[in-house]
Amino acid sequence: MAMTKHRKRDKQTVWLGDAEFDAELLPALTYFKRAGIQTEFSCAGVSLLDEPENHSLYAYITFITSKKTESFIEYSMERMRHRLLVTYEPSRKRYDPSSFFIGHNRRFCTLMNQYAQGFYLSQC
């Protein structure tokens, strides 16, 4: 017998400029913008408890390659260690850091917000 999945809350999105983003990554995206780090896509993912029908298995942010981006990627890899998976697409010149463990979307967002702020403040 299949279990009925009940929605706990809708996915929350906000507008930043002319693009819509997951609300849980807004602090990080704001710090990246202030630091001059260009992002292209992001997904906070949501848990099965929040959105049983339309959830993402992992959270990610796509960064356009630059010196600042590379510095942040290195900074976050040193701190997040095994919690972070980073892929690089040479043909598109972009990095895709994501949550390494399925189901750890909120922790990824919390850490990304924390390290985006720390990186930004270290650059000031």
Q: What spans do the regions from the language model cover?
A:
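Structured alpha/beta or helical-core interaction and ligand-binding surfaces enriched in interleaved
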Residues: 1-124
